[in-house]
């Protein structure tokens, strides 16, 4: 793959995923899973599961404190816009660090989901615009 192709692919991925997601997280894998049930239109679809891990960069260090990597928090599931008739689930792993000055576990905070949901902020806004509220039905979850 040429550098230009890599650049175009990255630009495309930035348009597909939630805003700024690829700035802080890197794609580590994906898989497609078949869903045996049919949707309300009688079409069998699948689910695209995308794995992302936070880049190794603690964003809010306190001056004079030192931080040591300490693995990852449990992956969070975030529902995003369907892609090619497939439900999209983002499995997002955030890093954690130990503040060696205080001994506390710390991590970066991101607004990845709309409040009270497991939907990406943009997807929840779209659903709210379409339905007047965010529906609690399985075709979107």
Task: State what each model feature region is.
Residues 1-58:
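N-terminal alpha-helical interaction blocks
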Residues 46-93, 98:
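N-terminal juxtadomain amphipathic helix
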Residues 77-141:
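Short, positively charged, Gly/Tyr-enriched micro-motifs
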Residues 27, 40, 44, 62, ...:
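Intrinsically disordered, low-complexity segments enriched in small/polar residues
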Residues 1, 5, 9, 13-18, ...:
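Short, flexible coil/linker segments at or flanking structured domains
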């Amino acid at each position: 793959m040429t550098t230009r192709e890599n650049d175009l692919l990255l630009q495309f991925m930035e348009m597909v995923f939630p805003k700024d997601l690829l700035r802080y997280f890197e794609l580590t894998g994906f898989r497609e899973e078949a869903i045996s049930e049919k949707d309300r239109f009688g079409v069998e679809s699948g689910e695209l599961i995308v794995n992302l891990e936070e880049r190794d960069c603690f964003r809010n260090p306190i001056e004079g404190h030192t931080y040591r990597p300490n693995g990852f928090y449990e992956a969070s599931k975030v529902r995003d816009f369907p892609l090619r008739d497939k439900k999209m689930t983002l499995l997002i792993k955030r890093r954690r660090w130990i503040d060696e000055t205080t001994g506390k576990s710390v991590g970066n905070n991101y607004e990845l989901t709309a409040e009270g949901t497991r939907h990406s902020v943009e997807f929840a806004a779209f659903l709210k615009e379409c339905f007047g509220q965010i529906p609690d039905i399985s075709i979107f979850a």
